[in-house]
Amino acid sequence: MIEARACFDAKLYTAAAVMVRRTLEGICIEQGTKKRALFQALQELRDDGKIEGRLFDWAQALRVLGNQGAHFSEESVDREDAADALSLAEALLNYIYVFTVKYEEFQNRRQSQGKTAG
């Protein structure tokens, strides 16, 4: 995400979208997906319960935007789309690496105290 943010700050919006896509690929690899294609790897994250429906939809939208930036066409990524891509990618990172861990810690603490979480 550091490179994506740097590209955005330099007004290189297409490059920022490509870096966001690269971040998605990194998340999938780090989460242990077996599928090589990003579309299928994101589906695997969803099917394994690591992301939910709306986050999956967001991730797919980011993948498409990243593809738009990565493949030559007359269509470039504008500032608003790049800003949205950064925001959505940060939300996805927070969900997987922050909120999920906090929820699991909460559940474990409650369980060790003999309480139910829900």
List each model region and its residues.
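Charged alpha-helical initiation segments
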Residues: M1-Y13, A117-G118
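Charged, alpha-helical scaffolding/interaction elements associated with membrane systems
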Residues: D9-A10, D48, F72
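Hydrophobic alpha-helical packing segments in soluble, helical-rich domains
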Residues: A16-T33
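Charge-enriched, short contiguous segments at helix-coil
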Residues: D57-V64, Q68-G118
